[in-house]
Amino acid sequence: MSIVRRDFRSELSGEKGESMNTVLEKIRKMGIVPVVVIENEKDAVPLADALCNGGLACAEVTFRTAAAGEAIRLMKEAHPEMLVGAGTVLTVDQVDRAVQAGAEFIVSPGFDPEIVDYCIKKKIPVLPG
């Protein structure tokens, strides 16, 4: 068995949004990415307001609730400058729904080759856990 290391960061830039390097640089500058679970989309904008007003214009919205996609959309609509990603992404369908909602990066809880390859192909920054 051989292990192949692949640095895919340079492959992730294009028309879909920011490059992987740009997203990672923004995260590095923030120092922390709050991981949030939003059960009700009405909580999304007040949360985004609080994060941005507190100097932390970044969030990873977990895709474990039915409200996640709409929450991402509302957060990006209220704060276009905010870096918003989708976390706990388990399927390619969730990748598509998250990106359509405005997610700028994808986080998966483990390394799923299907999700990573799909994101690379679609030029979506992905952080497999």
Predicted regions and their residues:
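Short, Lys/Arg-enriched N-terminal segments with co-localized hydrophobic residues
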Residues: R6-S19
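Conserved N-terminal beta1-alpha1 strand-loop-helix module at the mouth
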Residues: S19-A101
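Conserved anion-binding
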Residues: A67, D93, V99, E104-G129
